[in-house]
């Protein structure tokens, strides 16, 4: 193995020496390596992957204490021992220890959960590890690219990411995109003997290659060593920072007001003032926020993977929740991609050829191994698949590529004559055969006939090769026939599209097939037939009715596009994003990569190429549209949990800061910082369970609305703060509870007032999560078992502390079960208005409140709900009449009805629903057949009439 050591040390120039010398130096042959040789070479060269930086577990743990929210808590800890002096008391060690414990608890939970999430993500990403076709033990097989070693023989084809640095063997030239490595914008041609680099993408061709370098020894590996990874600040991080900053600023304002009032105006003692400031710092900071949100995302990501959608980028979850347009491939996503040919409909164009021979030529122009769906269909149509190569010797196979859109086989028959058979897109084959005008007309007529039935067309041609060379152009091509391909829709596609529309997601079909096929498939799936050819995207459509319509508007209103090339997909995504839509795009091929990268959510479908997977945000492990729609629902649940928590966190900050500031300044009552710590620790323990809470997903696409989060948080927090102020006034200045419930008076008893105030703040603070987690009444939407259990346990502990604890250092004394019962009753009574405030804020933020007040003067009406239902019904009727639809049955609505508040779909989805409704009513064997026969009889234009159908 001495020679291999030199290769590992890069002492041999394998990039430039002749290919035969490469085999000598690597001690291998064109038959590849054995498994044993591969294992031995892994010991020498290592696995074919880049070395991951080992992160110190200790530094990672401490990293969770290094963020703006933690800094505020750490500042509070320093204040507790450095500034909290005087008044004849020692430094505040209890608070210092308590703050450190709180920080350690949060960091520990974050560390454990992120570690678990990281392990789960690593296991998921292992499923996405690049695979490659490698020749081992004399057999071709698909293996993980990480096992490759110098000397392995690999196969590289269209859409593959080159798995290692390699030298090309005999075969056709490849087109390689190495822009990611060298910056070259156009694909470069690589001939046999040339070197290809790990990480570049095959754009055209197919060839075998011998591996010469792996892992860190590759061109890509060396470049990666020179570049530090850049930390991109994602949208999620920006939102997190904005919410954290809002809380920090709120606390800072409270502290400044306290300092100004307590010291210069009230002349309060220094030590008491510092403790009041500590209360705001400790209680106001949502220290658990980064932990709760990251854990929620990690758990959600794992749930998505179980449903068949692996998220490569964690923050894609929030974009998936906000997606309102999904551009979906037809083949394989909306349909089964299980093709069949109706032999009775095969059209023969060449003399002396029967339908069976057309099928045989199509099978010859197909692969017998490593097949795609069309190859499998063609070979499968033969009585015996072996007939595809029976009696002939294969010389050269031209694989499919997006430019030529055809495959071809050069072969020698039993008599020694050379022939070529080709199958592919009819337009390409017509051009290849240089057909006459009458033949073209006949071909297009048959294609249209197929398309009206929803059938795709496949053309077959042949030629003789008198020069007997695979590189020669050969004789003239002869157009042989047309085959009809039927790709049945998935059984669940129609229902899934209906669900998507109800969820406010508009599904647009993007297909390379003809317009007529797209329309027929759209009609069958109930997604409407408002489809356009790709030429309409460039404003070149022959349809005069489209000329006046701006391209942006056309794309927005279309149900789909036909005859689409990958560059059109990019344009569709770009235009929709300019119209402020959150766009999802599915793709599977190497040419889809730009559109997948451009889309807000790039979705690589099941069996996508390596290039499509690397460009996407989400990789599907199961076929069909239903996986995507399930993922949308799950993402909205995850997003809802995160949004619920952020509203809760902002509310608690405002409630603590405002409540304790008012009590400290009005009655000069100094609440113990240690008791706020107890509230914070119990709160954080409970709130961690929200990541697994049972939630109702938003009925419409959702996104971070910071104005809604801050407005709701401020209103709910202010209300709770005022409730606490009223409660303290009742126990501090009156005997209200003593008179009404017969409990002992604790008026002006500082330690007992502290216990009572602690319990009241603890109960309502935690109960608030049930309000923020629900869209309707909090007692109607059942929370998760874990959340309820954690709440009850935390409040049991809080109640026991208030009832029994006699802690002089925290200035509390047990108040007994009588007072505990009174405080629970008080908290429950003042809990109910929280829901009403929540509904009111939502109503005000929707803008409808101001419209009603200013435009309709609804403040002075006597109608139920200020006539809201009646006006909405009038609007809906007007809209439906405008589009030729019957008005729905009138339904009653209420201000706080969840379905009423959120039932309006986005305008674009509503339009698609209407078109789908019309399309379904035009099914065959109903009005459609009769109408079309009359139209043809009268010589009218069916397309014009379609636009004027009314129901």
UniProtKB/Swiss-Prot annotation:
Example of a GO biological process term? proton export across plasma membrane
| TM regions (residue ranges) | 61-81, 93-113, 243-263, 277-297, 614-634, 662-682, 709-729, 751-771, 785-805, 814-834
Keywords of the record: ATP-binding, Cell membrane, Hydrogen ion transport, Ion transport, Magnesium, Membrane, Metal-binding, Nucleotide-binding, Phosphoprotein, Translocase, Transmembrane, Transmembrane helix, Transport
Q: Does the keyword Phosphoprotein apply?
A: yes
Membrane protein topology class = Multi-pass membrane protein
Give the first-level EC class, as a single word.
translocase
Q: Which GO terms describe its molecular function?
A: ATP binding; ATP hydrolysis activity; metal ion binding; P-type proton-exporting transporter activity
Q: Report whether Iron shows up as a keyword of the record.
A: no
Location of the protein in the cell: Cell membrane
According to the UniProt topology, which residue ranges lie Extracellular? 82-92, 264-276, 635-661, 730-750, 806-813
* Protein name per its UniProtKB record: Plasma membrane ATPase
Q: Which organism is it from?
A: Triticum aestivum
Taxonomy, top ranks, is: Eukaryota, Viridiplantae, Streptophyta, Embryophyta, Tracheophyta
Q: Which gene encodes it?
A: ha1
């Amino acid at each position: 193995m001495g020679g291999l050591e030199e290769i590992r040390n890069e002492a041999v120039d394998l990039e430039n020496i002749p290919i035969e010398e490469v085999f000598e130096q690597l001690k291998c042959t064109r038959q590849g390596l054995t498994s044993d040789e591969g294992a031995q070479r892994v010991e020498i060269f290592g696995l074919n992957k880049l070395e991951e930086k080992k992160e110190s577990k200790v530094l990672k743990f401490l990293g969770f204490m290094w963020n703006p929210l933690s800094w505020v808590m750490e500042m509070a800890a320093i204040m507790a021992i450095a500034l909290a002096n005087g008044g004849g008391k020692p430094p505040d060690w209890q608070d210092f220890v308590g703050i450190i414990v709180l920080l350690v608890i949060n960091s520990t939970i974050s560390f454990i959960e992120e570690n678990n999430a990281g392990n789960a993500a690593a296991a998921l990403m292992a499923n996405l590890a690049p695979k490659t076709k490698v020749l081992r033990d004399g057999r071709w097989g698909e293996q993980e690219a990480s096992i490759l070693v110098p000397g392995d023989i690999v196969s590289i084809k269209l859409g593959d990411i080159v798995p290692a640095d390699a030298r090309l063997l005999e075969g056709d030239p490849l087109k390689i995109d190495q822009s990611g490595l060298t910056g070259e914008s156009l694909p470069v041609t690589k001939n046999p003997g040339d070197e290809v680099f790990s990480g570049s993408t095959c754009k055209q061709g197919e060839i075998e290659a011998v591996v010469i370098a792996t892992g860190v020894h590759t061109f890509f590996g060396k470049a990666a060593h020179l570049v530090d990874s850049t930390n991109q600040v994602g949208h999620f991080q920006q939102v997190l920072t904005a919410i954290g900053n809002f809380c920090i600023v709120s606390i800072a304002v409270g502290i400044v007001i306290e300092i100004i009032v307590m010291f210069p105006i009230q002349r309060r003692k220094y030590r008491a003032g510092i403790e009041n400031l500590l209360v705001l710092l400790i209680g106001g900071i949502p220290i658990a926020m980064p932990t709760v949100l990251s854990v929620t995302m990690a758990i959600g990501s794992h749930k998505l993977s179980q449903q068949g959608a692996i998220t490569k980028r964690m923050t894609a979850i929030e974009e998936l929740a906000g997606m309102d347009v999904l551009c979906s491939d037809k083949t394989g996503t909306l349909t089964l991609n299980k093709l069949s040919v109706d032999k009775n409909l095969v059209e023969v164009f060449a003399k002396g050829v029967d339908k069976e021979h057309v099928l045989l030529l199509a099978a010859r122009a197909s692969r017998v191994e490593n097949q795609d769906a069309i190859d499998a269909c063609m070979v499968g149509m033969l009585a015996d698949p072996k007939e595809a190569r029976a009696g002939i010797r294969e010389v050269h196979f031209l694989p499919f590529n997006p430019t030529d859109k055809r495959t071809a086989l050069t072969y020698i028959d039993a008599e020694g004559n050379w022939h070529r058979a080709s199958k592919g897109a009819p337009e390409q084959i017509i051009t290849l055969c240089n057909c006459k005008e009458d033949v073209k007309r006949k071909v297009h007529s048959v294609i249209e006939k197929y398309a009206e039935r929803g059938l795709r067309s496949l053309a077959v041609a042949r030629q003789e090769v008198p020069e007997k060379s695979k590189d020669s152009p050969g004789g003239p091509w002869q157009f042989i026939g047309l085959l009809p391909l039927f790709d049945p829709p998935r059984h669940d596609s129609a229902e899934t599209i209906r669900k998507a529309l109800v969820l406010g997601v508009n599904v647009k079909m993007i297909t390379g097939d003809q317009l007529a096929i797209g329309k027929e498939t759209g009609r069958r799936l109930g997604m409407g037939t408002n489809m356009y050819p790709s030429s309409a995207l460039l404003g070149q459509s022959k349809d005069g009715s489209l000329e006046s319509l701006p391209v942006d508007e056309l794309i927005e209103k279309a149900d789909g596009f036909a005859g689409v090339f990958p560059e059109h997909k990019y344009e569709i995504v770009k235009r929709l994003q300019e119209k402020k839509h959150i766009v999802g795009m599915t793709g599977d091929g190497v040419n889809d990569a730009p559109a997948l990268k451009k889309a807000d959510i790039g979705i690589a479908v099941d069996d996508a190429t390596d290039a499509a997977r690397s460009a996407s945000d989400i990789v599907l492990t199961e076929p069909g549209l239903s996986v995507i729609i399930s993922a949308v629902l799950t993402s909205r649940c995850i997003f809802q949990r995160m949004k619920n928590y952020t509203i809760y966190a902002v509310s608690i900050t405002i409630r603590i800061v405002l409540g304790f500031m008012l009590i400290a300044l009005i009655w000069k009552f100094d609440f113990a910082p240690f008791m706020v710590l107890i509230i914070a620790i119990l709160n954080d323990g409970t709130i961690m369970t929200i990541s697994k809470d049972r939630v109702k997903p938003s009925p419409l696409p959702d996104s971070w609305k910071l104005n809604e989060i801050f407005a709701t948080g401020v209103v709910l927090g202010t209300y709770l703060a005022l409730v606490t102020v009223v409660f303290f006034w009742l126990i501090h200045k009156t005997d209200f509870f003593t008179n009404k419930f017969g409990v002992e008076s604790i008026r002006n008893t500082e330690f007992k007032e502290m216990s009572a105030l602690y319990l009241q703040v603890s109960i309502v603070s935690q109960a608030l999560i049930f309000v923020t987690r629900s869209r309707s009444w909090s007692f109607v939407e059942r929370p998760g078992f874990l959340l309820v259990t954690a709440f009850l346990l935390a409040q049991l502990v809080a109640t026991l502390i208030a009832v029994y604890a006699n802690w002089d250092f925290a200035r509390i004394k047990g108040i007994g079960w009588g007072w505990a019962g009174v405080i629970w009753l008080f908290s429950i009574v003042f809990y109910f208005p929280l829901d009403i405030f929540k509904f009111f804020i939502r109503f005000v933020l929707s803008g409808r409140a101001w419209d009603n007040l200013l435009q309709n003067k609804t403040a002075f009406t006597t109608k139920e709900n200020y006539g809201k239902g009646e006006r909405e019904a009038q609007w809906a009727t007007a809209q439906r009449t405008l589009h030729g639809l019957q008005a729905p049955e009138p339904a009653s609505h209420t201000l706080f009805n969840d379905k009423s508040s959120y039932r309006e779909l986005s305008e674009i989805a509503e339009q698609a629903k209407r078109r789908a409704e019309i399309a379904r009513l035009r099914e065959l064997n109903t009005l459609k057949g009769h109408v079309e026969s009359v139209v043809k009889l009268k010589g009218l234009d069916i397309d014009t009439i379609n636009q004027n159908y009314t129901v």
